[in-house]
């Protein structure tokens, strides 16, 4: 460290002092405006994210309705084939019934997976 020179201490630097209005306009106003823009941007993004999630939930709800309709149609078709085998042999009706049951199980699994996905999305929305 070097020792301080007395001459250096005797001559303070001149600092320009701004009027309060100039200080506000020059420094604070730009910061305030930038913060307002950031808040508006975050608010818009929050709204868009909410709408995206609601849209996904709506799509999944429609998929669940379609799956349920398909399961019901498969069950009804299998029951109709069992009740009215017509000229078909008993073995073919049993095979069709088994296939319908397998498809119904697959669709039920898909529906369960979709329900779980919807629950996860709802849980993440609430977090």
From Swiss-Prot:
Keywords associated with the record: Coiled coil, Cytoplasm, Nucleus
Upper classification of the organism: Eukaryota, Metazoa, Chordata, Craniata, Vertebrata
Protein name as it appears in the record: MORF4 family-associated protein 1
Coiled-coil spans in chain: 92-126
Compartment annotation: Nucleus; Cytoplasm, Perinuclear region
InterPro entries: MRFAP1 (IPR029254)
Superkingdom of origin: Eukaryota
Pfam families reported in the protein's UniProt record: MRFAP1 (PF15155)
Broad class of the protein's primary localization: nucleus
Natural source organism: Homo sapiens
Complex formation: Found in a complex composed of MORF4L1, MRFAP1 and RB1. Interacts via its N-terminus with MORF4L1. Interacts with CSTB and MORF4L2.
Gene Ontology terms: cellular component: nucleoplasm; perinuclear region of cytoplasm
Family: Belongs to the MORF4 family-associated protein family.
């Amino acid at each position: 460290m070097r020792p301080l020179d007395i001459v250096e201490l005797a001559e303070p630097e001149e600092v320009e002092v701004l009027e309060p209005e100039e200080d506000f306009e020059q420094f604070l106003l730009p910061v305030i405006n930038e913060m307002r823009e950031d808040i508006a941007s975050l608010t818009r993004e929050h709204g868009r994210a909410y709408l995206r999630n609601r849209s996904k939930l709506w799509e999944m709800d429609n998929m669940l309705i379609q799956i349920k309709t398909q399961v019901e149609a498969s069950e009804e078709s299998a029951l109709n084939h069992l009740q009215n085998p017509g000229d078909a042999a008993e073995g073919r009706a049993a095979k069709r019934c088994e296939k319908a049951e397998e498809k119904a199980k697959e669709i039920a699994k898909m529906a369960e997976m979709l329900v779980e996905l919807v629950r996860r999305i709802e849980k993440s929305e609430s977090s």
